[in-house]
């Protein structure tokens, strides 16, 4: 009976060790994926920053991705140039307001 208990304990130890190694491998892969996502976040353009040269590079907000909004600026010389910034479109602001209000009411 003692031999059976020793063999069972040994098997449990081996199984737990091998499964923990597999979990460590998965965690390492997830860590690499998270690092790649973090690099992408660093490269995106934050809210209220200029996006004239990269109109699709705005970061994500709380619920939606910011949109590159452009306006035409007339200089004192009369030249027209386009200036763009990352911002939240009005319909996204309205949706965020409704969701925030719903969270306050329903907890």
Curated annotation (Swiss-Prot):
InterPro entries: Spider_toxin_CSTX_knottin, Spider_toxin_CSTX_Knottin_CS. It holds the Pfam family Toxin_35. One of its GO terms (molecular function) is toxin activity. The keyword Secreted applies. Disulfide bonds join 44-59, 51-68, 58-86, 70-84. Expressed by the venom gland. This is U1-lycotoxin-Ls1b. It comes from Lycosa singoriensis (Wolf spider).
